[in-house]
C-alpha cells in the first residue's frame, strides 16, 4: 500500500486516560444495587454527582451529557511510607469511641463470652477496657493474634465466598490492626487449658513487643489507651467533642453503641456490664410500652 493510503495516527491527549468498565461487576449484589440506584436517579444525576464529587461542586458539567475538565499540575507518583499507610487505612475503620467499643465487644461475643465488662476512664479518652469470659487465646495462637493485628488476618473467613456464611460480628481482619495503629493496645488473656494468663503489649504496627505471665481469669481483656493519639488533629477533635458532650455522654454513647441502647449505664461514672442470655428479643428496649410500640407500631 502507498503512503497516501495509510491512516494518520490518532492524536493522544496530554496526560493519562483512566477507563473503568463495569464498576462493581465482581460483586453481583452490589452491582445490581448500583444499577438500580443509577436508574432511579437519572433525572437528578448531574446534580447529585457534582454534590458527591466535591471538587465538581458548582460545576456546570451536566454529566454524563458533557465531560468535565480538570487541570492539575503533574506530580511524580511515589510510594507512601508503610507507617503512614497503616494510619491512613485505620482511620475509616475506627471512626469514634463507640466504633472502637463495638469492635472490641463484637470480638468478645465471637469468642463465646456470656459476661462482658466495659470500663471507660475519663470518658474513654484515657482508657477503654473490655473484659469477656470467652474461650481465651492459647499460647500457640499468640503468633496468630499478632498476625491478626496486621490488616486482613482473621480466623473468621478464608476467601470471598465465605462471606455468604458469616455468622460472626467481625470478619474483615481490620479491627485489632486499626486499634494498634491509633492507640496503645494491651491484651491480657487466659485459655481454659492454661494455668496462668499472659499479658501481650502491641506496638503501633501490630507486633507483640512484650509478653509476660499475668494472673487473669479465663477469657480476654483488651485495653486501649489514648485512642487517636497517633493522629494529633483527630485526637484534639476527639477530646473536644467528648468534653462538649459530657452532660449527655451516657445517652449519646448508648445510642451509638446499639447493644447498649436502653441501658441505664451512666458511663463513665459506673462501668457497664453485658450479659448474653440466649433469649431472642425483637426489641432492644426493656420497657413494655416501647416494646409494644416497636413491634406493633
UniProtKB/Swiss-Prot annotation:
One of its GO terms (molecular function) is ATP-dependent DNA damage sensor activity. It comes from the Eukaryota. Highly expressed in kidney, spleen, adrenal gland, esophagus, duodenum, colon, bladder, ovary, cerebrum and cerebellum and to a lower extent in lung, liver, stomach, uterus and pancreas. Not expressed in heart. Pfam families: HATPase_c_3 (PF13589). One of its GO terms (biological process) is mismatch repair. Transmembrane segments: none annotated. One of its GO terms (cellular component) is mismatch repair complex. PANTHER family: DNA MISMATCH REPAIR PROTEIN MLH, PMS, MUTL, MISMATCH REPAIR ENDONUCLEASE PMS2. Encoded by one of the numerous copies of postmeiotic segregation increased 2-like genes scattered in the q11-q22 region of the chromosome 7. Belongs to the DNA mismatch repair MutL/HexB family. This is Putative postmeiotic segregation increased 2-like protein 2.
Amino acid at each position: 500500500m502507498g503512503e497516501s493510503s495509510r491512516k494518520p495516527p490518532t492524536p493522544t491527549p496530554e496526560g493519562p486516560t483512566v477507563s473503568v468498565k463495569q464498576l462493581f461487576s465482581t460483586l453481583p449484589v452490589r452491582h445490581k444495587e448500583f444499577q438500580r440506584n443509577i436508574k432511579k436517579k437519572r433525572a437528578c444525576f448531574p446534580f447529585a454527582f457534582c454534590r458527591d464529587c466535591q471538587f465538581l461542586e458548582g460545576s456546570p458539567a451536566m454529566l454524563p451529557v458533557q465531560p468535565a475538565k480538570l487541570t492539575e499540575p503533574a506530580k511524580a507518583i511515589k510510594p507512601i511510607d508503610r507507617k503512614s499507610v497503616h494510619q491512613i487505612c485505620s482511620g475509616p475503620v475506627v471512626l469514634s469511641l463507640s466504633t472502637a467499643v463495638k469492635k472490641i465487644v463484637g470480638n468478645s461475643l465471637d469468642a463465646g463470652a456470656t459476661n462482658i465488662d466495659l470500663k471507660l476512664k475519663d470518658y474513654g479518652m484515657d482508657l477503654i477496657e473490655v473484659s469477656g469470659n470467652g474461650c481465651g487465646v492459647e499460647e500457640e495462637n499468640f503468633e496468630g493474634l499478632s498476625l491478626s493485628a496486621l490488616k486482613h488476618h482473621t480466623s473468621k473467613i478464608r476467601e470471598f465466598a465465605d462471606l455468604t456464611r458469616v455468622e460472626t460480628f467481625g470478619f474483615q481482619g481490620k479491627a485489632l490492626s486499626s486499634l494498634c495503629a491509633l492507640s496503645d493496645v494491651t491484651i491480657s488473656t487466659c485459655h481454659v487449658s492454661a494455668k496462668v494468663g499472659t499479658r501481650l503489649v502491641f506496638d503501633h504496627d501490630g507486633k507483640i513487643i512484650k509478653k509476660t505471665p499475668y494472673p487473669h481469669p479465663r477469657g480476654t481483656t483488651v485495653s486501649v489507651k489514648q485512642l487517636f493519639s497517633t493522629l494529633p488533629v483527630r485526637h484534639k477533635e476527639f477530646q473536644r467533642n467528648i468534653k462538649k458532650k459530657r452532660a449527655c455522654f451516657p445517652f449519646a454513647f448508648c445510642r451509638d453503641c446499639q447493644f447498649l441502647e436502653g441501658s441505664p449505664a451512666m458511663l463513665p461514672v459506673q462501668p457497664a456490664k453485658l450479659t448474653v442470655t440466649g433469649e431472642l428479643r425483637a426489641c432492644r428496649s426493656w420497657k413494655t410500652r416501647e416494646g409494644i410500640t416497636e413491634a406493633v407500631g
